[in-house]
Amino acid sequence: MRLSIERSALLKALGHVQNVVERRNTIPILSNVLMSAEDGQLTLVATDLDIEVSEITAADISAPGQVTAPAHTLYDIARKLPDGSQVVLQINADDRLDVDAGRSHFTLPLLPSGDFPKMTADGFTHEFSISTKDFSRLIDKTRFAISTEETRYYLNGIYIHGHAGKLRAVATDGCLLYTSPSPRDRQKSRMPSSA
C-alpha cells in the first residue's frame, strides 16, 4: 500500500474515527484503525465492538492495500504536522507503516488487517433515513436522561424506535424517562384543546 494525502484531509478523517478507539485496550487490534486504499479513496474504520465508525476521504493511491495502524499515534502525528503538507503513507519492507511529510519521518507497527473485527449490517430488521441535523437534535434532546451508573449498564444508551414512518428516541436512568419524537412527529402532532 502506498498513498499520498493532504494533512488536513487525513486529520479530519482520523479525528472522526479515533474517538471510538480507547487508548488502552485489552484487545490490541481495537487500538488500531483499519485503512483501506483503493480507487482514489482512503477508507478509515475504527470499532470498540459496540460502535463502528468509518470515514472515506480522497487520496492519491499509488499502490492499493489494507493495513491497521495505531489510531491515536497516527492521529497525534497528523495533528502535529504543518498545515498544507502532503502525507505519504506506505508499507515498508519490514511490514511497518512509514509516515512521511516533508522532513518528518515516522515508522509505526502494524497488525494484520485480517484480524480487524468486521461489523456487518446483516440481521438488522429496521432501517431509517434522517438528516444529520435532525438526528443530532434527536440525540441531543434525549441524552440527558441516559444513566451514567456502571452498575446499570443496560440503561447506558438511547433506544431508537421507528414505526409507521415516525422515529422516537427514548432514554432513562431509572428515575427519569424521556421520549423525543422526530421532527416530523412534532410538525404533525396537535395538542387537544382544553374542554
Could you describe each region identified by the protein language model?
Residues 183-185, 189-195:
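Positively charged, low-complexity/disordered segments
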Residues 1-180, 184:
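Structural preference for solvent-exposed beta-strand-turn elements
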